[in-house]
Amino acid sequence: MTAPAASVGSTPALSLALPVRLDATNAETVSRELMARLRDSAGGQLAEVDATALQSFDSSALATLLALQRLATEKGSRLELRAAPVRLVELARLYGMQDLLLPQTESKAV
């Protein structure tokens, strides 16, 4: 599902990829897999979440991202969301979570 990314400075980044669909039907499984990858990674590094493939989602996607953000913070790591669909950014704003989840988000046109 995911592969390590190129190094950022001297600390390698962890690359996590969101699936095409992330909603209530698969959020628990996706979250468990991504959290395990993040949990097993070294602390203090950049963890990039690539949302390029994400096309269909609901608020469960935000819950998954929030859980990843919390774990990254606990590990002293930084989480960055890449290529977020415009609709995901809008959903985060609707829930008042844009500053927490999307501070440096690079969104893609949808």
PLM segments and residue spans:
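STAS-like cytosolic regulatory interaction modules
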Residues: M1-F57, A67-V110
